[in-house]
């Protein structure tokens, strides 16, 4: 696979002498082999490629056939692979045009037993799609008895990130797919079984979230997911895309205010509470601003801090004594989730954010009115009904990135149509801070926010801390001061909570964390073994 690397650059900002240097992400681009894709398209029955017909014209006709089921498929700058029976679809369209009934009355019959896509977004950076399947409806998968359809994700990347020090997961061949996709490899990383292959010069990734362990009731295990993935990959067909003349991507600059804020202070990225990492591992000292964005909370002040290792007041009490500046990173705090960017290989997938103290505190650590959450960027919503996680996905000529919000109430999100196929504008109200985690009042009143970027191993979590710092500076109109010395005693303010550094809370005695079934205590690197921890669908943090 040919790539065009883009060297990481420093942001042009007048940082203080002590502040860490803000970085831009390092990107690579796939060089798409459109002649090879054209040759593959030419063999599709029903397309009737004409002599001397150019590849753009052929793909234009192919896109016209597919777009009813894959909206805006022509926007993809890479060839789109999907489980769509394009040959039957083309034959049926010819029959319908001549007044002959087609062979399929229901559009879903074109998807080889899979449901029509729950999400599809194509653009200059590539495409991402989410399909689903009810295993009990498929003869060869009917022994996998689950009440809900299983989701399968597929991505084709023109733009992807090159992450420093990301551990290389163990790769295994899949003999059943080798003939069709030479070099395809299966791996397990960050809670997903993943299938990586290159075609037409483009890296593609198919992934299914699964539990790596013994069979459990109502839980998809990875040996079952493997069978579903093989069925899915065998159904893939080349169904669209458009050759595009695009310049190499240039990550946008994140502009910081020139004036210092008199109050906002923060510890640098990776400065998690001592002892709070998995096996005392440190945090991830990542100064990368992965994208310019709006801060996810509508109003300031807001506080980035630990929900576990910082002293907490009782339920329903005013939180002003708990949450104050300075901010502290808690990406890679000890959790049961695999995160490749964490030095210990396991940890917190994002950053917890607490809003200002409640105007009207209620019981069970809730607020009335609740604090509003807004879209950090203009983009496409990716979320199925009942799911707790909501993503905003951005796909343009310079970026491919997704932002995830957790702990909003699924019922309210369903009622307000915060679902796939909806687009939002930056700053648009999308919900409220809540306490939902698998159930109401399942966690403290806060927002979990994380960022995922595409890599040659698929979508992975990266440290959102500095991205949030810069977004918050934009919200308050002043640059924060990074702290390097040990926390000192906070000085009380007559007008509200302390604004100087607070004394660090002593973390609890180091304990061996309780790991989930299937996690290897002797392995600290995601993907080092197929027996590794997984995160529950759409509820990880």
Regions inferred by a protein language model and the residue ranges of each:
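Short glycine/threonine/proline-enriched tight-turn/helix- or strand-capping micro-motif at secondary-structure
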Residues: 286, 290-373
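Sec-dependent signal peptide recognition
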Residues: 2-9
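Short, surface-exposed secondary-structure boundary micro-motifs
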Residues: 386, 429-435
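Surface-exposed amphipathic alpha-helical segments
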Residues: 207-249
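Short, solvent-exposed recognition patches
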Residues: 21-202
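N-terminal signal peptide c-region/cleavage motif recognized by signal peptidases
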Residues: 12-16
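Zn2+-dependent peptidoglycan hydrolase active-site motif and core
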Residues: 340, 347-349, 363-417, 444-450
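Acidic, glycine-rich catalytic/binding loops that coordinate metals and/or anionic ligands
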Residues: 254-293, 374, 413-428, 439-541
């Amino acid at each position: 696979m040919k790539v065009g690397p883009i060297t990481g650059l420093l942001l042009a900002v007048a940082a203080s002498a002590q502040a860490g240097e803000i970085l831009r992400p390092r990107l690579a681009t796939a060089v798409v082999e459109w002649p090879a894709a054209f040759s593959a398209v030419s063999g599709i029955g029903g397309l009737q490629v004409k002599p001397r017909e150019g590849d753009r014209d052929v793909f234009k006709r192919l896109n016209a056939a597919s777009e009813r089921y894959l909206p805006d498929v022509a926007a993809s700058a890479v060839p789109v692979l999907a489980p769509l029976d394009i040959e039957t679809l083309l034959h049926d369209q010819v029959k319908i045009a001549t007044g002959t009934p087609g062979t399929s009355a229901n559009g879903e019959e074109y998807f080889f037993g899979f449901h029509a896509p729950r999400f599809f977004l194509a653009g200059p950076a590539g495409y991402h799609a989410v399909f689903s399947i009810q295993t009990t409806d498929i003869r060869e998968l009917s022994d996998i008895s689950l009440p809900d359809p299983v989701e399968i994700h597929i991505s084709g990347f023109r733009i992807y990130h090159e992450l420093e020090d990301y551990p290389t997961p163990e790769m295994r061949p899949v003999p059943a797919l080798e003939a069709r996709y030479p070099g395809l490899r299966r791996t397990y990383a960050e809670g997903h079984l993943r299938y990586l292959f290159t075609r037409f010069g483009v890296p593609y990734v198919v992934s299914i979230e699964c539990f790596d362990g013994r069979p459990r009731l109502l839980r998809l295990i990875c040996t079952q997911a493997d069978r579903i993935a093989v069925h899915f990959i065998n159904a893939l067909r080349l169904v669209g895309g458009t050759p595009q003349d695009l310049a190499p991507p240039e990550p946008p600059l994140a502009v910081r205010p020139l004036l210092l804020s008199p109050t906002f202070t923060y510890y640098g990225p990776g400065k998690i509470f001592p002892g709070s990492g998995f096996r005392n591992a440190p945090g991830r000292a990542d100064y990368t601003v992965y994208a310019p964005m709006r801060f996810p909370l509508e109003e300031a002040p807001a506080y980035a801090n630990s929900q576990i290792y910082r002293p907490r007041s009782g339920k329903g009490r005013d939180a002003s004594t708990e949450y104050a500046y300075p901010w502290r990173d808690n990406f890679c705090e000890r959790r049961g989730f695999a995160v490749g960017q964490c030095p210990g290989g396991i940890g917190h997938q994002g950053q917890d954010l607490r809003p200002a103290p409640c105007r009207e505190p209620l019981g069970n650590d809730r607020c009335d009115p609740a604090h509003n959450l807004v879209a950090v960027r203009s983009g496409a919503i990716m979320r199925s009904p009942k799911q707790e996680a909501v993503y905003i996905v951005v796909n343009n000529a310079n970026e491919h990135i997704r932002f995830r919000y957790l702990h909003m109430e699924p019922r309210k999100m369903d009622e307000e149509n915060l679902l796939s196929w909806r687009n939002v504008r930056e700053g648009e109200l999308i919900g409220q801070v809540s306490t939902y985690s698998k159930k109401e009042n399942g966690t403290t009143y806060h927002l979990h926010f994380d960022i995922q970027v595409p890599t040659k191993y698929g979508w992975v979590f990266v440290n959102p801390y500095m991205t949030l710092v810069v977004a918050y500076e934009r919200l308050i109109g002043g640059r924060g001061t990074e702290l390097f010395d040990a926390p000192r005693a906070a000085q009380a303010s007559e007008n509200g909570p302390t604004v100087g550094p607070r004394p660090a809370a002593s973390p609890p005695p180091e304990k061996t964390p309780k790991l989930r079934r299937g996690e290897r205590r002797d392995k600290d690197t995601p993907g080092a073994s197929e027996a590794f921890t997984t995160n529950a669908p759409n509820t990880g943090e």
